[in-house]
Amino acid sequence: MNTILAQQIANEGGVEAWMIAQQHKSLLRFLTCGSVDDGKSTLIGRLLHDTLQIYEDQLSSLHNDSKRHGTQGEKLDLALLVDGLQAEREQGITIDVAYRYFSTEKRKFIIADTPGHEQYTRNMATGASTCDLAILLIDARKGVLDQTRRHSFISTLLGIKHLVVAINKMDLVDYREETFARIREDYLTFAEQLPGDLDIRFVPLSALEGDNVAAQSANMRWYSGPTLLEVLETVDIQRAVDRQPMRFPVQYVNRPNLDFRGYAGTLASGSVKVGERIKVLPSGVESSVARIVTFDGDKEEACAGEAITLVLNDDIDISRGDLLLAANETLAPARHAAIDVVWMAEQPLAPGQSYDVKLAGKKTRARIEAICYQIDINNLTQRDVESLPLNGIGLVEMTFDEPLALDIYQQNPVTGGLIFIDRLSNVTVGAGMVRELDERGATPSVEYSAFELELNALVRRHFPHWDARDLLGDKHGAA
């Protein structure tokens, strides 16, 4: 067993008290990314090693694996703690997105180790989609490369505002301050083109030797800033969703018996209280919150990120994919939008193609109307293209089969982010971030009688194969 962990548990007064203390720590999700062999996996292994998160059996296994697959001679190859796939160990690269967990006395962390090779950019985008901070590794011998620019742009495109530029392998350039200063200046010049108001920090380090990772380096006395671990422990993550209006996508209608009907999901943004008036989209029907049910019992209020079940005072028609928001909020469903796309399939994305798209719990179909441009990640310029290739990033105009309640991605990633699904293979082929909504052709408001609405709901519920259109959602089909 990890002796440090055992000591922490003893200090807290037992396992239960330790687990409660862990629950109250803040959580930081971050990813490591950069060019091939910049030392991403080694850095994560060093963090785990120097924060004493490795168990004795893991350390013993690491010694054996280092002899068979290691690339560091007689030294421990800390990258093997993360490179779990056999193909990764044999090739000496990271292929899949590897997730690891560790904690310190101040904070707990979830790490995503993402691939450096260009052909695995789609894997990197997947890892970045849930993170608050990105560590961009740069080889001190090579400086800023194309893949560094690509990963920087993808990170900011996916809403990451905190970038830590870790200039690694300083031991191979004799820990020279001028090398660090030159790379820092080069990156800041490039970063002027990145979108948004970014928090960028620079740390010179050596993941292999441990310099400035968890402890200050005696080899770089010219650097007076914090270590990488200190940056991770103290960075103030301001999540935009905490300040946004309430959004609650319904993931599941929970009805275990005739006396209970609740709507389960994760509160995407804002907060909700018992007694608050809410509105359901796309129907527009209003009700009020009777209960907020959680695993730990009922609550009076829930905040963004909490998994909850809402019980309403009225028995109304709500299905998976519907969106609940405050009754006084206005969010007009849209059928047209401009979407930033990261394409992940071998077959290029082209105008005229149709895909299934999934947004929160909602699944519908969409058609590609036009590709506005592809972004050249070397200089972040826009160029006209007829199609978007594998790993291509560009702006696309789309039309949905039915009006969707959408937010701008930078304001709310949950209700502004979607994935493209191939209709034949059911494989995820792309990721989309809503840039701009277009309300042209919005369906005019039509008043239906209560009988018409109830009959329509009855037919759609019990005879889905009729493909009856939703009178309130403008879902076209044959009645």
Curated annotation (Swiss-Prot):
GO molecular function, a single term: ATP binding
Region G3, annotated ranges: 113-116
Keyword ATP-binding: yes
Residue ranges occupied by any tr-type G domain in the UniProt entry: 25-239
Residues holding GTP: 34-41, 113-117, 168-171
Region span, G5: 206-208
Root EC class: transferase
UniProt region (G1), positions on chain: 34-41
Catalytic activity, as annotated: sulfate + ATP + H(+) = adenosine 5'-phosphosulfate + diphosphate
Biological-process GO terms, alphabetical: hydrogen sulfide biosynthetic process; sulfate assimilation
Residue numbers spanned by region G4: 168-171
Entry-linked PANTHER family: TRANSLATION FACTOR
Function in brief: With CysD forms the ATP sulfurylase (ATPS) that catalyzes the adenylation of sulfate producing adenosine 5'-phosphosulfate (APS) and diphosphate, the first enzymatic step in sulfur assimilation pathway. APS synthesis involves the formation of a high-energy phosphoric-sulfuric acid anhydride bond driven by GTP hydrolysis by CysN coupled to ATP hydrolysis by CysD.
Protein name: Sulfate adenylyltransferase subunit 1
Phylogenetic classification of the source organism: Bacteria, Pseudomonadati, Pseudomonadota, Gammaproteobacteria, Enterobacterales
